[in-house]
Amino acid sequence: MQDIRNIAIIAHVDHGKTTLVDKMLLAGNLFRENQQAGDLILDNNELERERGITILSKNVSINYKGTKINVIDTPGHSDFGGEVERVLNMADGCILLVDAFEGPMPQTRFVLQKALEIGLKPVVVVNKVDKPNCRPEEVYEMVFDLMFSLNATEDQLDFPVVYGSAENGWMSPDYKKETGDITYLLDTIIETIPAPKQLEGTAQMLITSLDYSTYTGRIAVGRIHRGTLKSGQNITIVHRNGSMEKTKIKELHTFEGMGHRATEEVCSGDICAVVGLTNFEIGDTICDFETPEALPTISIDEPTMSMLFTINNSPFFGKEGKFCTSRHIGDRLNKELEKNLALRVEMKDGSTDQWIVSGRGVLHLSVLIETMRREGYELQVGQPQVIYKEINGVKCEPVEELTINVPEEFSSKMIDLVTRRKGEMLSMEAQGG
Protein backbone atom coordinates (compact mmCIF):
# COMPACT_ATOMS: atom_id res chain seq x y z
CA MET A 1 0.00 0.00 0.00
CA GLN A 2 1.66 3.23 -1.11
CA ASP A 3 1.83 6.25 1.16
CA ILE A 4 -0.20 9.08 -0.44
CA ARG A 5 -0.66 12.81 0.19
CA ASN A 6 -3.30 14.83 -1.68
CA ILE A 7 -2.66 18.58 -1.72
CA ALA A 8 -4.26 21.55 -3.45
CA ILE A 9 -2.28 24.72 -4.17
CA ILE A 10 -3.98 28.05 -3.43
CA ALA A 11 -2.48 31.31 -4.64
CA HIS A 12 -3.27 34.68 -6.16
CA VAL A 13 -2.58 35.32 -9.83
CA ASP A 14 1.15 35.78 -10.41
CA HIS A 15 2.36 34.76 -6.97
CA GLY A 16 4.33 31.92 -8.54
CA LYS A 17 2.06 28.91 -8.11
CA THR A 18 2.75 27.24 -11.44
CA THR A 19 6.49 27.95 -11.11
CA LEU A 20 6.48 26.24 -7.71
CA VAL A 21 4.78 23.15 -9.17
CA ASP A 22 7.42 23.11 -11.94
CA LYS A 23 10.16 22.97 -9.31
CA MET A 24 8.33 20.24 -7.36
CA LEU A 25 8.12 18.15 -10.53
CA LEU A 26 11.85 18.62 -11.07
CA ALA A 27 12.54 17.63 -7.46
CA GLY A 28 10.57 14.44 -8.09
CA ASN A 29 13.03 13.63 -10.93
CA LEU A 30 10.23 13.66 -13.44
CA PHE A 31 12.40 14.61 -16.40
CA ARG A 32 15.37 12.71 -17.71
CA GLU A 33 18.59 14.70 -17.63
CA ASN A 34 18.61 15.12 -21.40
CA GLN A 35 14.94 16.08 -21.58
CA GLN A 36 13.85 19.67 -22.04
CA ALA A 37 11.74 20.53 -19.02
CA GLY A 38 10.47 23.95 -20.10
CA ASP A 39 8.78 26.28 -17.64
CA LEU A 40 5.14 26.80 -16.75
CA ILE A 41 4.75 23.08 -17.41
CA LEU A 42 1.23 23.04 -16.00
CA ASP A 43 -0.19 25.98 -17.92
CA ASN A 44 -0.04 24.05 -21.15
CA ASN A 45 -2.99 25.80 -22.71
CA GLU A 46 -1.83 28.71 -24.94
CA LEU A 47 -4.24 31.18 -23.37
CA GLU A 48 -3.04 30.28 -19.88
CA ARG A 49 0.55 31.02 -20.80
CA GLU A 50 -0.30 34.36 -22.42
CA ARG A 51 -2.47 35.65 -19.63
CA GLY A 52 -0.39 34.06 -16.88
CA ILE A 53 -3.46 32.52 -15.30
CA THR A 54 -4.56 28.98 -14.60
CA ILE A 55 -7.99 28.31 -16.07
CA LEU A 56 -8.41 24.55 -15.86
CA SER A 57 -7.56 22.65 -12.72
CA LYS A 58 -4.97 19.97 -13.37
CA ASN A 59 -3.57 17.00 -11.53
CA VAL A 60 0.04 15.89 -11.40
CA SER A 61 1.79 13.54 -9.05
CA ILE A 62 5.31 13.44 -7.68
CA ASN A 63 7.12 10.50 -6.11
CA TYR A 64 9.32 11.68 -3.28
CA LYS A 65 11.06 9.33 -0.80
CA GLY A 66 8.53 6.60 -1.58
CA THR A 67 5.51 8.84 -0.96
CA LYS A 68 3.19 9.75 -3.79
CA ILE A 69 2.19 13.43 -3.60
CA ASN A 70 -0.84 14.26 -5.75
CA VAL A 71 -0.72 17.98 -6.53
CA ILE A 72 -3.98 19.59 -7.59
CA ASP A 73 -3.51 22.99 -9.23
CA THR A 74 -6.54 25.22 -8.65
CA PRO A 75 -7.56 28.29 -10.65
CA GLY A 76 -7.29 31.41 -8.48
CA HIS A 77 -9.84 33.50 -10.35
CA SER A 78 -13.35 33.74 -8.92
CA ASP A 79 -14.81 33.36 -12.44
CA PHE A 80 -13.57 29.79 -12.33
CA GLY A 81 -15.01 29.20 -8.87
CA GLY A 82 -16.93 26.24 -10.23
CA GLU A 83 -13.55 24.57 -10.74
CA VAL A 84 -12.19 25.44 -7.30
CA GLU A 85 -14.81 23.89 -5.05
CA ARG A 86 -14.90 20.55 -6.80
CA VAL A 87 -11.15 20.26 -6.80
CA LEU A 88 -10.72 21.00 -3.09
CA ASN A 89 -12.90 17.99 -2.33
CA MET A 90 -10.10 15.75 -3.61
CA ALA A 91 -7.44 17.12 -1.25
CA ASP A 92 -6.57 16.45 2.41
CA GLY A 93 -4.50 19.58 2.83
CA CYS A 94 -3.48 22.70 0.96
CA ILE A 95 -0.44 24.84 0.28
CA LEU A 96 -1.24 28.53 0.64
CA LEU A 97 1.26 30.41 -1.50
CA VAL A 98 1.67 34.14 -0.89
CA ASP A 99 4.02 36.78 -2.26
CA ALA A 100 6.51 38.05 0.34
CA PHE A 101 5.79 41.64 -0.70
CA GLU A 102 2.06 41.71 -1.52
CA GLY A 103 0.75 39.30 1.11
CA PRO A 104 -2.60 37.53 0.84
CA MET A 105 -4.87 39.03 -1.85
CA PRO A 106 -8.67 38.97 -2.34
CA GLN A 107 -8.69 35.91 -4.60
CA THR A 108 -6.54 34.01 -2.14
CA ARG A 109 -9.18 34.76 0.46
CA PHE A 110 -11.96 33.38 -1.76
CA VAL A 111 -10.29 29.98 -2.27
CA LEU A 112 -8.82 29.77 1.24
CA GLN A 113 -12.24 30.28 2.79
CA LYS A 114 -13.59 27.32 0.82
CA ALA A 115 -10.58 25.19 1.81
CA LEU A 116 -10.90 25.98 5.53
CA GLU A 117 -14.64 25.26 5.47
CA ILE A 118 -13.95 21.77 4.12
CA GLY A 119 -11.39 21.32 6.93
CA LEU A 120 -8.15 21.13 4.94
CA LYS A 121 -4.87 21.48 6.84
CA PRO A 122 -2.79 24.39 5.44
CA VAL A 123 0.97 24.73 4.86
CA VAL A 124 1.94 28.37 4.19
CA VAL A 125 4.66 29.13 1.65
CA VAL A 126 5.95 32.71 1.54
CA ASN A 127 7.40 33.00 -1.96
CA LYS A 128 9.70 35.53 -3.66
CA VAL A 129 11.67 36.39 -0.50
CA ASP A 130 14.64 37.22 -2.73
CA LYS A 131 12.88 40.32 -4.08
CA PRO A 132 13.93 43.74 -2.75
CA ASN A 133 11.53 45.44 -0.29
CA CYS A 134 9.89 42.16 0.69
CA ARG A 135 8.48 41.79 4.21
CA PRO A 136 8.14 38.07 5.01
CA GLU A 137 7.46 38.52 8.74
CA GLU A 138 4.62 40.99 8.21
CA VAL A 139 3.15 38.75 5.52
CA TYR A 140 3.19 35.84 7.98
CA GLU A 141 1.22 37.97 10.47
CA MET A 142 -1.23 38.95 7.71
CA VAL A 143 -1.82 35.30 6.78
CA PHE A 144 -2.44 34.41 10.42
CA ASP A 145 -4.94 37.28 10.81
CA LEU A 146 -6.67 36.27 7.57
CA MET A 147 -7.07 32.66 8.70
CA PHE A 148 -8.32 33.82 12.08
CA SER A 149 -10.93 36.07 10.45
CA LEU A 150 -12.05 33.13 8.27
CA ASN A 151 -12.82 31.12 11.44
CA ALA A 152 -10.00 28.59 11.07
CA THR A 153 -9.83 25.92 13.79
CA GLU A 154 -6.95 25.80 16.30
CA ASP A 155 -5.40 22.91 14.41
CA GLN A 156 -5.55 24.87 11.13
CA LEU A 157 -4.04 27.97 12.80
CA ASP A 158 -1.08 25.87 13.94
CA PHE A 159 0.34 25.86 10.42
CA PRO A 160 4.01 25.46 9.39
CA VAL A 161 5.58 28.28 7.35
CA VAL A 162 8.13 27.75 4.60
CA TYR A 163 10.06 30.68 3.10
CA GLY A 164 11.77 30.63 -0.25
CA SER A 165 11.95 31.52 -3.91
CA ALA A 166 10.31 29.16 -6.39
CA GLU A 167 12.00 30.97 -9.27
CA ASN A 168 15.46 30.23 -7.84
CA GLY A 169 14.40 26.80 -6.63
CA TRP A 170 14.95 26.92 -2.86
CA MET A 171 12.79 26.64 0.28
CA SER A 172 13.85 26.91 3.91
CA PRO A 173 12.42 27.41 7.43
CA ASP A 174 14.24 30.75 7.69
CA TYR A 175 14.08 33.35 4.91
CA LYS A 176 17.58 34.63 5.73
CA LYS A 177 19.16 31.21 5.10
CA GLU A 178 19.08 30.18 1.47
CA THR A 179 19.18 26.43 0.77
CA GLY A 180 19.99 24.71 -2.50
CA ASP A 181 16.69 22.95 -3.21
CA ILE A 182 13.03 22.68 -2.24
CA THR A 183 13.19 19.37 -0.37
CA TYR A 184 12.36 21.17 2.91
CA LEU A 185 8.91 21.97 1.49
CA LEU A 186 8.31 18.38 0.36
CA ASP A 187 9.38 17.07 3.79
CA THR A 188 7.01 19.56 5.47
CA ILE A 189 4.13 18.39 3.26
CA ILE A 190 4.73 14.74 4.17
CA GLU A 191 4.96 15.55 7.92
CA THR A 192 2.07 18.02 8.17
CA ILE A 193 -0.61 16.93 5.72
CA PRO A 194 -2.51 13.85 6.88
CA ALA A 195 -2.55 10.72 4.72
CA PRO A 196 -6.01 9.94 3.33
CA LYS A 197 -8.11 7.72 5.56
CA GLN A 198 -8.37 4.11 4.40
CA LEU A 199 -12.06 3.24 4.41
CA GLU A 200 -12.98 -0.42 3.97
CA GLY A 201 -16.19 -1.47 2.24
CA THR A 202 -17.83 -1.32 -1.16
CA ALA A 203 -16.34 1.07 -3.70
CA GLN A 204 -17.40 4.73 -3.78
CA MET A 205 -15.94 7.52 -5.90
CA LEU A 206 -17.33 11.00 -6.48
CA ILE A 207 -16.65 12.32 -9.99
CA THR A 208 -15.17 15.77 -9.37
CA SER A 209 -13.59 16.59 -12.68
CA LEU A 210 -13.50 15.60 -16.34
CA ASP A 211 -10.71 14.85 -18.71
CA TYR A 212 -11.13 14.49 -22.43
CA SER A 213 -9.26 12.31 -24.87
CA THR A 214 -9.84 12.24 -28.61
CA TYR A 215 -9.48 8.45 -28.55
CA THR A 216 -11.58 7.41 -25.57
CA GLY A 217 -13.91 10.40 -25.19
CA ARG A 218 -14.81 11.70 -21.75
CA ILE A 219 -12.86 10.43 -18.76
CA ALA A 220 -14.17 10.65 -15.19
CA VAL A 221 -11.64 11.90 -12.64
CA GLY A 222 -12.11 11.75 -8.90
CA ARG A 223 -10.83 10.50 -5.61
CA ILE A 224 -11.79 7.06 -4.37
CA HIS A 225 -13.62 7.64 -1.12
CA ARG A 226 -13.96 4.03 0.03
CA GLY A 227 -12.98 0.54 -1.10
CA THR A 228 -11.09 -0.26 -4.31
CA LEU A 229 -11.85 -0.06 -8.03
CA LYS A 230 -10.50 -2.60 -10.50
CA SER A 231 -10.06 -2.48 -14.25
CA GLY A 232 -12.92 -4.31 -16.00
CA GLN A 233 -15.16 -4.16 -12.91
CA ASN A 234 -18.95 -3.86 -13.25
CA ILE A 235 -20.21 -0.75 -11.46
CA THR A 236 -23.30 1.38 -10.92
CA ILE A 237 -23.33 5.12 -11.59
CA VAL A 238 -25.72 7.04 -9.34
CA HIS A 239 -26.65 10.32 -11.05
CA ARG A 240 -27.26 13.60 -9.24
CA ASN A 241 -31.03 13.20 -9.63
CA GLY A 242 -30.92 9.76 -7.96
CA SER A 243 -31.34 7.62 -11.10
CA MET A 244 -28.95 4.68 -11.52
CA GLU A 245 -27.19 3.10 -14.45
CA LYS A 246 -25.23 -0.16 -14.64
CA THR A 247 -21.99 -0.06 -16.63
CA LYS A 248 -18.42 -1.34 -16.74
CA ILE A 249 -14.96 0.22 -16.29
CA LYS A 250 -12.83 -0.29 -19.40
CA GLU A 251 -9.57 1.05 -18.00
CA LEU A 252 -8.29 2.64 -14.80
CA HIS A 253 -5.51 5.22 -14.86
CA THR A 254 -3.58 6.82 -12.02
CA PHE A 255 -1.69 10.09 -12.38
CA GLU A 256 2.03 9.78 -12.70
CA GLY A 257 4.05 12.90 -13.26
CA MET A 258 2.33 14.90 -15.99
CA GLY A 259 0.47 12.00 -17.57
CA HIS A 260 -1.69 8.97 -16.88
CA ARG A 261 -0.56 5.39 -16.35
CA ALA A 262 -2.90 2.41 -16.78
CA THR A 263 -3.24 0.29 -13.67
CA GLU A 264 -5.23 -2.76 -12.59
CA GLU A 265 -6.46 -1.53 -9.21
CA VAL A 266 -6.75 1.75 -7.27
CA CYS A 267 -7.31 1.92 -3.50
CA SER A 268 -9.22 4.45 -1.42
CA GLY A 269 -7.56 7.84 -0.97
CA ASP A 270 -5.86 7.90 -4.37
CA ILE A 271 -6.97 10.03 -7.31
CA CYS A 272 -7.71 8.18 -10.53
CA ALA A 273 -9.22 8.51 -13.99
CA VAL A 274 -11.89 6.05 -15.15
CA VAL A 275 -12.07 5.37 -18.89
CA GLY A 276 -15.00 3.85 -20.78
CA LEU A 277 -18.02 5.41 -19.07
CA THR A 278 -20.39 7.19 -21.42
CA ASN A 279 -23.25 8.79 -19.58
CA PHE A 280 -22.01 10.67 -16.51
CA GLU A 281 -21.83 14.19 -15.10
CA ILE A 282 -19.73 15.85 -12.43
CA GLY A 283 -21.28 15.15 -9.03
CA ASP A 284 -22.29 11.57 -9.93
CA THR A 285 -21.03 8.68 -7.78
CA ILE A 286 -19.38 5.51 -9.09
CA CYS A 287 -20.36 2.72 -6.70
CA ASP A 288 -20.64 -1.01 -6.20
CA PHE A 289 -22.59 -3.00 -8.81
CA GLU A 290 -24.91 -4.74 -6.34
CA THR A 291 -25.20 -2.34 -3.39
CA PRO A 292 -24.87 1.21 -4.73
CA GLU A 293 -24.56 3.98 -2.12
CA ALA A 294 -24.27 7.55 -3.40
CA LEU A 295 -21.99 10.18 -1.87
CA PRO A 296 -23.40 13.70 -1.29
CA THR A 297 -23.08 15.53 -4.61
CA ILE A 298 -21.23 18.82 -5.13
CA SER A 299 -22.97 22.09 -5.76
CA ILE A 300 -21.65 24.10 -8.67
CA ASP A 301 -21.90 27.89 -8.82
CA GLU A 302 -24.78 29.10 -10.95
CA PRO A 303 -23.98 31.30 -13.99
CA THR A 304 -24.35 35.05 -13.39
CA MET A 305 -24.32 36.51 -16.90
CA SER A 306 -25.14 35.54 -20.47
CA MET A 307 -24.13 36.50 -24.00
CA LEU A 308 -25.71 35.91 -27.38
CA PHE A 309 -23.60 33.81 -29.78
CA THR A 310 -24.61 33.74 -33.44
CA ILE A 311 -23.13 33.05 -36.88
CA ASN A 312 -21.23 35.79 -38.66
CA ASN A 313 -23.69 37.33 -41.14
CA SER A 314 -21.63 40.42 -41.94
CA PRO A 315 -20.11 41.15 -45.39
CA PHE A 316 -16.80 39.70 -44.11
CA PHE A 317 -18.32 36.23 -43.69
CA GLY A 318 -15.74 33.43 -44.11
CA LYS A 319 -12.68 35.72 -44.30
CA GLU A 320 -11.03 34.75 -41.01
CA GLY A 321 -12.28 31.38 -39.85
CA LYS A 322 -12.97 28.08 -41.49
CA PHE A 323 -15.96 26.99 -39.34
CA CYS A 324 -18.71 29.50 -40.01
CA THR A 325 -22.02 27.62 -40.14
CA SER A 326 -24.53 27.28 -37.33
CA ARG A 327 -23.98 23.51 -37.26
CA HIS A 328 -20.26 23.97 -36.56
CA ILE A 329 -20.81 26.54 -33.81
CA GLY A 330 -23.62 24.51 -32.23
CA ASP A 331 -21.48 21.34 -32.15
CA ARG A 332 -18.53 23.24 -30.65
CA LEU A 333 -20.66 24.76 -27.87
CA ASN A 334 -22.12 21.35 -27.02
CA LYS A 335 -18.62 19.88 -26.90
CA GLU A 336 -17.54 22.65 -24.52
CA LEU A 337 -20.41 21.75 -22.19
CA GLU A 338 -18.85 18.32 -21.68
CA LYS A 339 -15.86 19.74 -19.85
CA ASN A 340 -16.81 23.29 -18.87
CA LEU A 341 -19.01 22.94 -15.84
CA ALA A 342 -20.30 26.37 -15.02
CA LEU A 343 -21.41 26.95 -18.62
CA ARG A 344 -25.01 26.75 -19.88
CA VAL A 345 -26.02 26.86 -23.56
CA GLU A 346 -29.57 27.15 -24.89
CA MET A 347 -31.09 28.00 -28.26
CA LYS A 348 -32.73 31.40 -28.50
CA ASP A 349 -36.51 31.02 -28.85
CA GLY A 350 -37.66 30.80 -32.45
CA SER A 351 -34.13 30.81 -33.88
CA THR A 352 -31.92 28.11 -35.39
CA ASP A 353 -28.60 29.94 -35.39
CA GLN A 354 -28.54 31.93 -32.15
CA TRP A 355 -27.50 30.61 -28.75
CA ILE A 356 -27.66 32.16 -25.32
CA VAL A 357 -24.45 31.16 -23.52
CA SER A 358 -24.37 31.75 -19.75
CA GLY A 359 -21.22 31.71 -17.64
CA ARG A 360 -19.65 32.82 -14.35
CA GLY A 361 -18.37 36.18 -15.56
CA VAL A 362 -16.71 38.18 -18.31
CA LEU A 363 -13.38 36.36 -18.03
CA HIS A 364 -15.04 32.94 -18.18
CA LEU A 365 -16.88 33.77 -21.41
CA SER A 366 -14.00 35.71 -22.99
CA VAL A 367 -11.72 32.68 -22.57
CA LEU A 368 -14.30 30.53 -24.39
CA ILE A 369 -14.67 33.07 -27.24
CA GLU A 370 -10.90 33.43 -27.65
CA THR A 371 -10.39 29.63 -27.62
CA MET A 372 -13.05 29.21 -30.31
CA ARG A 373 -11.54 32.00 -32.42
CA ARG A 374 -8.13 30.31 -32.33
CA GLU A 375 -9.64 27.00 -33.34
CA GLY A 376 -10.91 28.66 -36.52
CA TYR A 377 -14.54 29.37 -35.60
CA GLU A 378 -16.14 32.56 -36.84
CA LEU A 379 -18.96 34.00 -34.78
CA GLN A 380 -20.66 37.17 -33.58
CA VAL A 381 -21.28 37.81 -29.89
CA GLY A 382 -23.72 40.18 -28.25
CA GLN A 383 -23.27 42.33 -25.16
CA PRO A 384 -23.08 40.60 -21.77
CA GLN A 385 -26.47 40.58 -20.00
CA VAL A 386 -27.27 39.76 -16.39
CA ILE A 387 -29.45 36.71 -15.86
CA TYR A 388 -32.92 37.29 -14.41
CA LYS A 389 -34.72 34.49 -12.61
CA GLU A 390 -38.31 33.89 -11.66
CA ILE A 391 -38.54 32.77 -8.06
CA ASN A 392 -42.10 32.02 -6.84
CA GLY A 393 -43.56 34.10 -9.66
CA VAL A 394 -41.43 37.17 -8.87
CA LYS A 395 -38.81 38.37 -11.35
CA CYS A 396 -35.47 38.61 -9.51
CA GLU A 397 -32.08 39.94 -10.57
CA PRO A 398 -28.69 38.74 -9.30
CA VAL A 399 -27.12 40.78 -6.51
CA GLU A 400 -23.37 40.83 -5.94
CA GLU A 401 -22.13 40.93 -2.37
CA LEU A 402 -19.13 43.22 -2.08
CA THR A 403 -16.78 43.26 0.91
CA ILE A 404 -14.13 45.99 1.04
CA ASN A 405 -11.30 46.20 3.59
CA VAL A 406 -9.59 49.61 3.58
CA PRO A 407 -7.81 51.90 6.04
CA GLU A 408 -10.29 54.21 7.78
CA GLU A 409 -9.29 57.38 5.92
CA PHE A 410 -10.43 55.86 2.59
CA SER A 411 -13.81 54.59 3.77
CA SER A 412 -15.82 57.68 2.73
CA LYS A 413 -14.30 57.53 -0.76
CA MET A 414 -15.28 53.85 -1.04
CA ILE A 415 -18.85 54.48 0.11
CA ASP A 416 -19.15 57.29 -2.44
CA LEU A 417 -17.82 55.06 -5.24
CA VAL A 418 -20.22 52.20 -4.51
CA THR A 419 -23.34 54.31 -3.91
CA ARG A 420 -22.82 55.98 -7.30
CA ARG A 421 -23.27 52.53 -8.79
CA LYS A 422 -26.53 52.07 -6.88
CA GLY A 423 -24.85 50.01 -4.16
CA GLU A 424 -26.57 49.63 -0.81
CA MET A 425 -24.52 49.61 2.39
CA LEU A 426 -25.50 46.84 4.79
CA SER A 427 -22.85 47.06 7.50
CA MET A 428 -19.64 48.87 8.33
CA GLU A 429 -17.30 47.95 11.14
CA ALA A 430 -13.91 49.17 12.32
CA GLN A 431 -11.36 46.46 13.04
CA GLY A 432 -8.11 46.60 14.99
CA GLY A 433 -6.36 49.83 15.84
Model regions and ranges:
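P-loop NTPase switch module centered on the Walker A-proximal segment
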Residues: 1-98, 102-104, 138, 142, ...
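Active-site phosphate-binding and catalytic loops of NTP-dependent enzymes
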Residues: 30-57, 80, 146-159, 190-203, ...
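Residue-level signature of catalytic and energy-coupling elements of molecular machines
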Residues: 14, 20, 52, 71-73, ...
